Amino acid sequence: MTLLALKEDRPTPKAVYNWRVYTCAAIASFASCMIGYDSAFIGTTLALPSFKKEFDFASYTPGALALLQSNIVSVYQAGAFFGSLFAFATSYFLGRRKSLIAFSVVFIIGAAIMLAADGQGRGIAPIIAGRVLAGIGVGGASNMVPIYISELAPPAVRGRLVGIYELGWQIGGLVGFWINYGVNTTMAPTRSQWLIPFAVQLIPAGLLFLGSFWIPESPRWLFANGKREEAMKVLCWMRNLEPTDRYIVEEVSYIDADLERYAREVGKGFWKPFLSLKQRKVQWRFFLGGMLFLWQNGSGINAINYYSPTVFRSIGITGTNTGFLTTGIFGVVKMVLTIVWLLWLVDLVGRRRMLFIGATGGSLCMWFIGAYIKIAGPGSTKAEDAKLTSGGIAAIFFFYLWTAFYTPSWNGTPWVINSEMFDQNTRSLGQASAAANNWFWNFIISRFTPQMFIKMEYGVYFFFASLMLLSIVFIYFFIPETKSIPLEAMDRLFEIKPVHNANKILMAELNFDRNPEREESSLDEKDRVTQTENAV
C-alpha cells in the first residue's frame, strides 16, 4: 500500500479527487488559521516585557496576576462557546458559506477593538472585550468548517480534507508561537512590540472573508433546502463529473434517501432537530461527540497552548527568549506531525487506532514529566541563566515525545469524527453541540490552569496523565471506526455491536449491497469447488 493509497467505499473516478475540493477545503480552513493563531499567540504575548510594562504587571500579587491572565485568555473561550451555538441558527437560515462570512466579520471587529488597548486611559478592557467578539467568531467558524468540508468530501478522503482544517490550526499556531520570539529578539520593548502580534490576527480572518465569496455552498445543504438545480451544479463542479455519471447518480440517490428518511422520522424545520433529541440514538451520538472533547482537553493540550511560558518554567526553562524558543519548537513539531496525520494516518490507520496510540503514549510521557518535577523541583529555580540538569533535558524530551503522540491522534481526530457522525438533519446541531463542548472544556482549562500550577504543581501533569488513561477505555467501548463510511450510513454504523468490529461489518454490508450479483457468483463458485472436492 502506497503512502497516499485510499480505501474507497465504492469505485470512484479519479476525477473526483481534484483540485477543487482541496481548494475549497483550504480556503475554509483559513478559519482554523485564525483559531490556531489566537490560541497560540496570547500566552507568549502576555509574557512580553513590553506588555508587562504597558499594563503594569509588576504591581499585581501572584494570585491577582494569575487571575487577570486567566481572564484575558478565557473570555475568548467563553465567546467561542456561544459562537458555536449561534452557528446552528446561522447555518440553518444562511447556509454554511454565508455563515463563514458572518463569523469572519465578527472576528475582524473583535481583533480591531483589541488594538485600541493601552496602559493609560482605555486600559486592558478593549483586549478583553475584543477577545469576547473574536471568540464568538472562532466559535462559529469551528462549528461551520468541519461540517462544510465533510459535506463536500468524497468518503475516501473525508478524513484528509477535514484534516486540512486541523493543518490550518497548526499553521496559525506555528505563526502565533514564533511571532513573539521574533518581536522579542528584534524589537525594543515598546508599544509596537506587543501590538504587532495582536494586529496579525486580521490576516487569516481577512483571507477567510475574501475567500468565502469564491467557494460554493455545500451541495448537501442545498439539497436539504430544496435548491436542487443549484445543488446538482455545485456537486458536479466539485466532483468534476457530468450529471449522468454513475458516481453522481449514486451520490444523489444516497443524499435523497437520507433526507427522505429523516423527513419521515424527524421532519423539517429549525426546531425539528431539537425534537429529535428525544431519540436515544441521537442523545447518545451527542454525548459521544461532547465526551471526545472532554478527553481532548483533558490531555493538557490547551494548558500548554495558552500558558506555554508557565508550563516550560515548571520544567525548569528560564529566560523569556528561551521559553519562546522552546514554545516555537513545540509549534514546529505539531505542524510536521499534523501533515503526517493528514496525508497518511487519519484515512489509512484510522481514527480509533490513532486515539489509542496517542492516549497511551501521551499518558506515559505526562507521568514521567510529573515525576521529574516532584523529585527535582526545577520550577523553584529563579535564576535566568540556570542550567538544565540531565533530568530536565529528559523531561523536555518527554514533553516533545508527548507532542508526537498527541498531535497525530487527539489533536484533530475528534473534529473529524464529529463532522462525520451526525445525519443531515442533526448535523448542524450536533456539530454546534460538539464545538460548544470543545470550547466549554477549553474555557475550564484556560480559566483555571494558572491556579492549578500554583496549587497542584507537579500534580497537574499526573491529572492530565490520568485523564488520558481513562480516555482509552472510553474509545474502546463506545467509539466505532468511521473511516471510509459514507455519511449516509453513519446511523447503521452506530447501531452495530460490538463497537470494535462495526466498521468491518458495515463495509462488508455496503459492498454486498452494491455487488449482490458478484457476491452470489462468488458463493456459487465456492459451492462448485466444494462439490468437486467432495467428489474427489
UniProtKB/Swiss-Prot annotation:
The keyword Glycoprotein applies. Disulfide bonds: none annotated. It comes from the Eukaryota. Residues 516-536 are annotated as: Disordered. One of its GO terms (molecular function) is carbohydrate:proton symporter activity. CDD domains: MFS_HXT. This is Quinate permease. It holds the Pfam family Sugar_tr. It is a multi-pass membrane protein. Glycans are attached at residue 184. InterPro entries: MFS_dom, MFS_sugar_transport-like, MFS_Sugar_Transporters, MFS_trans_sf, Sugar/inositol_transpt, Sugar_transporter_CS. Residues 1-26, 96-98, 153-160, 217-285, 350-352, 411-435, 480-536 are cytoplasmic. One of its GO terms (biological process) is quinate metabolic process. Keywords: Glycoprotein, Membrane, Quinate metabolism, Transmembrane, Transmembrane helix, Transport. Belongs to the major facilitator superfamily. Sugar transporter (TC 2.A.1.1) family. GO terms for cellular component: membrane. The chain crosses the membrane at residues 27-47, 75-95, 99-119, 132-152, 161-181, 196-216, 286-306, 328-349, 353-373, 390-410, 436-456, 459-479. It is found in: Membrane.
